[in-house]
Regions:
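Conserved lysine of the Walker
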Residues: 38
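Hydrophobic positions on the alpha1 helix immediately C-terminal to the Walker A/P-loop
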Residues: 41
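NTP-dependent small-molecule kinase module
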Residues: 1-21, 118, 136, 140, ...
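Active-site signature of alpha/beta-hydrolase-fold catalytic machinery across serine-
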Residues: 44
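Conserved nucleotide-sensing/catalytic segment adjacent to the nucleotide-binding pocket
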Residues: 65-110, 121
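Short hydrophobic/aromatic beta-strand immediately N-terminal to the Walker A/P-loop
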Residues: 27-29
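Short beta-strand-centered segment that lines the nucleotide-binding/catalytic pocket of NTP-utilizing
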Residues: 51-65
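P-loop (Walker A) phosphate-binding loop of NTP-binding proteins
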Residues: 33
Length: 205
């Protein structure tokens, strides 16, 4: 099981690693339970380390027409992890600029090209970011979690009337992915955001 640390300890670890002036970017991957605060933690880290870029797995959903039959019951089947790896993660890991088009589920379309300059710290955040297809391009894997009760409270606040459907559809897929690939057990570190101040007064995302 990964060692549990605080967000402050993670900041210290990253600061020490970056102070060594590594020859390649440090790629931090934040995976974990929905509502645990992965995006909130990534936002905090980018404020702490301005020379960084953030890649969101949410930008790499597959368009519905490209998803296999029965994808709703298969972990990761709604994600285009190959495109994430080839267009964004691999170039960032190699210290190259990143050019990619996010897919918007809300709009049902690809968005204009985004260009991100190479930076010494790359933060990949979102569900499925520790998938074996991506792991070879990651320096440090951190699993972000919270208690079941706190997760329910946060998701109800975030999703509102959509919570019941969200909980029935996405949480089982996510937990299946964690179990299939032993994501929580194999992470380098873990951050538990259950404590009330873990998200610094912001809604955890």
């Amino acid at each position: 099981m990964a060692q549990n640390i605080t967000p402050e300890s993670l900041i210290s670890i990253l600061a020490a690693a970056l102070a060594q002036k590594p020859t390649k970017p440090l790629v931090l991957a934040l995976d974990g339970r929905c509502g645990s605060g992965k995006t909130t933690l990534a936002d905090r880290l980018t404020r702490q380390f301005p020379a960084s870029i953030v890649l969101h797995t949410d930008d790499f959903y597959l368009p519905p027409a490209q998803r296999v039959r029965g994808w709703e019951k298969t972990p990761c089947a709604n994600m285009d992890l190959t495109r994430l790896r080839d267009e964004a993660l691999r170039p960032a890991y190699e210290g190259q600029p990143v050019l990619y088009r996010a897919y918007s589920c809300r709009a049902g379309a690809y968005q204009p090209v985004q260009e991100l300059a190479a930076q010494p710290l790359v933060i990949l955040e979102g569900s499925y970011s520790h998938h074996p297809l991506l792991a070879g391009y990651e320096t440090l894997q951190v699993f972000v979690t919270c208690s079941r009760e706190e997760q329910t409270h946060r998701l109800q606040a975030r999703e509102g009337e959509r919570y019941a459907n969200f909980s029935a559809r996405w949480i089982p897929l996510e937990e299946g992915y964690f179990a299939q690939y032993r994501i929580e057990e194999t992470a380098d570190l873990a951050v538990d955001t259950t404590a009330a101040n873990a998200c610094a007064g912001m809604m955890c995302r």
